[in-house]
Amino acid sequence: MEKSQGYLELDKSWRHDFLYPLIFQEYIYALAHEQGLNRSILVENTDHDNKYSSLIVKRLITLIYQQNHFLIFDNDSNQNPFWKHNNNLYSQTISEGFVIIVEIPFSPRFVDSLEEKKKILKSNNLRSIHSIFPFLEDQILHLNFVANILIPYPIHLEIVVQSLRYRVKDASSLHLLRFFLFTLNKSISSFSKRNQRFFLFLYNSHVYEYESTFLFLRNKTSHLRSTSSGAFLERIFFYGKIKHLIEVFANDFQAILWLFKDPFMHYVRYQGKSILASKRTSLRMNKWKYYLVNFWQCQFYVWSQPGRVSINQLSNHSLDFLGYLSSVRRNPLAVRSQMLENSFLTDNAIKKFDIIVLLISLIGSLAKAKFCNVLGHPLSKPARADSSDSDIIERFVRICRNLSHYHSGSSKKKSLYRIKYILRLSCARTLARKHKTTVRSFLKRLGSELLEEFLTEDGQVISLIFPRTSSTSWRLYRGGIWYLDITCINDLANHE
């Protein structure tokens, strides 16, 4: 009940464009801490005992606005552990609070908490990451060319703030964000590594701006969610973008609009990359390449080069995104036809959308998480002294099942067997290390209990739906299985 009340307070402040006071609310940091615990099954939460309070946040913000705040970033700051500790403390705390304030109104849990009050109709299937693959299976077989795009980064932090102000109307919050970013400008590299979620939000906000421009040009209507006078100002802003586009491409602006409305164009964005797939010719794809580069440079002041957009033919190229390697391959098929006394043998080629899991990338992610080495040999994980054997086994089994669940769409399951073997043996070595014994003697004492925990397969789940005598479950298990309840990328699949 308290959590739902917190979400309702967030909604009230969000709709009144008054976010700055929320930074001083303790439940904001409780929500941020809870999301950090549940975000990944692989995160080792070593700072789970840290407590946030409004008093700490007030002191940290006061410290930012003090006249001598530059002492924190002085060259001698490394000699003063107190200032170094405060630097890390307030940057981590305030960035988490700011992101959670802006992110929560768009989160599924927030929508669920308001469902009864506002009668919001939701569709969990559309939120699923896996929902894109059935769409690709139906559409990509009819497409010819694909453009792999490396999305350019903004050259200055002020561009990011300017992009965000069309979504966040609270001037105080934007002023704090601007001051916060420029204060940390000298140590932005190390800060971005510690606060990846913060910079990921800023980056997505910036990319959303030019994506919304494309959508606006395509639909010829405003899809913005703002109310009152805000919608009018934003509509003016979008018409200003169109006017600027007309000035840049004065000769062929109508051709550009016709290009944007191409019904055979499909767009997918994943992290810092995006994919444009089309049924048209390579000439049409090169036009897209030209317009995109000029649009980034002229409208969003982002330096880009044509080399960041590569055009390939789908029949000779594989798509690498969301932890899968997707490609269109041709299966030869010979058909014998009989006509009276003559028979004909016809060779046909059937297109098939093939999706596999990159085993090398998965092993690399497991090695980065210290489950194995770079060659795939399992390693033991350090276990806490107060962790029971069942807790350790449950953690490894949860990781294994989540990986199997996420990569269930692969048409080749053998790579998943190797991953399960690594996790199972890593679990056994972790338990043997805790009990100060060998893996062989520990497995002999434990028996088959450890193995049974890892034997829950997706095929067994499907067999509960279909009759055991039917071969449907086996055919489905051998092929791709897409789950429509996956709303985030598994950290092990996120190997980029």
Curated annotation (Swiss-Prot):
The lineage of its organism: Eukaryota, Viridiplantae, Streptophyta, Embryophyta, Tracheophyta. HAMAP family: MatK (MF_01390). It comes from Paeonia officinalis. GO terms for molecular function: RNA binding. Belongs to the intron maturase 2 family. MatK subfamily. Usually encoded in the trnK tRNA gene intron. Probably assists in splicing its own and other chloroplast group II introns. The gene is matK. It is found in: Plastid, Chloroplast. GO terms for biological process: mRNA processing; RNA splicing; tRNA processing. PANTHER family: MATURASE K. Signal peptide: none annotated. Keywords: Chloroplast, mRNA processing, Plastid, RNA-binding, tRNA processing. This is Maturase K.
